[in-house]
């Protein structure tokens, strides 16, 4: 992944809208500064909603972030994008708990992002 592709998104504390940019995480809080903002314009975000950009895109060119939900075209499967510490990679974790390397799945399947676990909670 290129250095300029390292970015995060999270939900703002003030209005629950998504904000993207650079992350500053402290012991009990997190802040994001948008790439278009001044250096002193940090936005307080909910630390539990912080998602890192994977550096990958779906079949429609939508950027894939950690905790995004994806659908496999031609299959009745959905998965969540997660970071795996043991694999040091982003994984697609199916509802049936099987997991696959995300960069591999994108090469062999047509996948489409349809939301994320924070906006599509059951």
Describe each region flagged by the PLM.
Residues 1-122:
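Secondary-structure transition motif
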């Amino acid at each position: 992944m290129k250095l300029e592709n390292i970015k995060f998104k999270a939900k703002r504390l003030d209005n629950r809208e998504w904000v993207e940019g650079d992350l500053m995480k402290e012991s009990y809080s997190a802040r994001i500064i948008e790439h278009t903002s001044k250096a002193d314009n940090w936005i307080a975000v909910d630390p539990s909603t912080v998602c890192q950009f994977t550096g990958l895109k779906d079949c429609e060119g939508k950027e894939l972030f950690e905790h995004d939900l994806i659908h496999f075209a031609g299959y009745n499967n959905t998965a969540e994008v997660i970071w795996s510490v043991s694999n040091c990679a982003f994984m697609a974790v199916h509802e049936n708990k099987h997991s696959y390397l995300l960069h591999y799945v994108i090469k062999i399947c047509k996948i489409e992002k349809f939301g994320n676990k924070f906006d599509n909670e059951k």
